[in-house]
Amino acid sequence: MCSNIKINQLKFVIDMKTMKLWRIAFMMLTAFSIASCGSDEPRYADPEAHEKTVQLNEQYGPLMVGTWHYENISDTQCYFERLTFQADGTLTGMRKWQTRKPVTIDGKEQHTDWEDVELSGTFTGTWQLRYWSPEGNSGEKRNCLQLTATYDDAGRDYMAYSCALTFAYADATTLRIQGYYVKAPDGWINYQRGPSEPSF
């Protein structure tokens, strides 16, 4: 009698383990089938911004690649910048910037000597075209050129660029972006294609 009870208990334990294995197998099969119902396409937090970023890069990405320069000289400021954009998203650049102040000496208007601005130097970093709002949810989305660059010489605790500039267009000769350090009266800078050196 004792052996029948032990056999029945053993059968019960085996049946319970078998049922547990079947439940685990069923749950795994269900999980796999649910997971396979999804698309292989990535999901984006803002699909519209992603699509417009793709279009922006298809239209202007190849035109951005190359070297661009900008120079602006006035009575009180000389500014030159050269940017080289690579297809892999890397950036190299050079900035030369000098300023002087108007002064009056013995009733005569003069200028101080030219002084180098500490933001002059060479730098490396990355660039990216994006459709987004740099201000976050409160700002208006727009085409932007995002620049992140550090100076090549050690010891500077500030960036050469860490910004998203409004991007207008790039073509065979001109790159038009919102001014950052300097700008035209309308707030824009027109870079010209090609390598160049400062004239000052």
Language-model regions, residue ranges each:
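An anionic, turn-rich surface loop/hairpin at beta-sheet edges
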Residues: G139-T166
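Bacterial N-terminal signal peptides that target proteins for export
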Residues: V13-A25
